[in-house]
Every structure is written in C-alpha cells, then in structure tokens.
Amino acid sequence: MKKIFLFLICCWTISASAQVQKVNLQASGLTCAMCSKAIYKAVSAISFVDTVLVNIEASTYDIRFDKETTPRFDQIAKAVVDAGFSVANLTVMVNFDKQAVDKNGLFTLDGIQFKLMGTPLASLQGSKKLQLVGKPYMLPKDLKKIPAAQLGNVASNTYLVSLK
C-alpha cells in the first residue's frame, strides 16, 4: 500500500510541474544575425531557462525551462528589452489537466496567476497556447487594437492572457 501511495504522489508531482511546456518569443527590432545572438545570450543567461532554439528568419525563439523551476515571463521580456529589442509576441504552451478557471477568468498554474480574456471558461483541458497580453509582451501598436474594457484591472502579479 505504501508503494502505491508513493507512486501516486510521484505521478502527481511530475504532472503538476510539467504544465508549462515552453514559450515561443517573437522579437522586434532585429536587423542582423548579431541581433539574434544578443537576444539568445540574454535569454540563455536566465537561471530557469534550459534551452533556447533560434529561428533567425522569423525572429522567434523557442524557450524551454528547467523542470524544477517556475518560469517568470516578466524576466524573459526584461532580458529582451535589456538587450535593446522589443517583444512582439510571447506565447506560452501549456498542457492543462482539468485546470479550474473561476468566474472572473482567473486561474493559477505552477504558482503563477493568470487572467483569461474573453469568455470565461469553467476549466481548461489539453494542450493550449496562451498569448500574454499587455506591455511588455506585445508591441504597442498591437496593444492598441485591444479594447480597454477587455484589458480591465489586473493585479500586478497576474498575467493577462488570451487563448490562441
């Protein structure tokens, strides 16, 4: 009985920590391969980042994390800005397992609070893409396209997201 209990605890721990799979970052303001390299170095230096795969033509970066850490998306965006560039898009790939969402669209994932824009859902299931909304996760011209009412009041420790 002890072995079964320990096995179940291990399985639960593994599934809970593996929810955030990766981040896809699209940068803006790049003009050459050296620009891509500057962002690569800045993002790779973040303590919780495991690997960074670069697509120079699309100016995108697939970022994977150390399994025992919680990613901080604000630190990723700050690294890009500190390198002298802008974040055009930051999309988080998440594997949900019946994730509860409250009536205000709030849910917590790996200790990180999110607010879902648009129609509130009761739960999230399966693999989903969450686009981070707001400054510094998108370009100002794209942010202006979102009605202010949809942005609403969001706590400073909460990420505003939309399903992609």
What does each model-identified segment do?
Residues 56-108:
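Mid-chain, structured segments of secreted extracytoplasmic proteins
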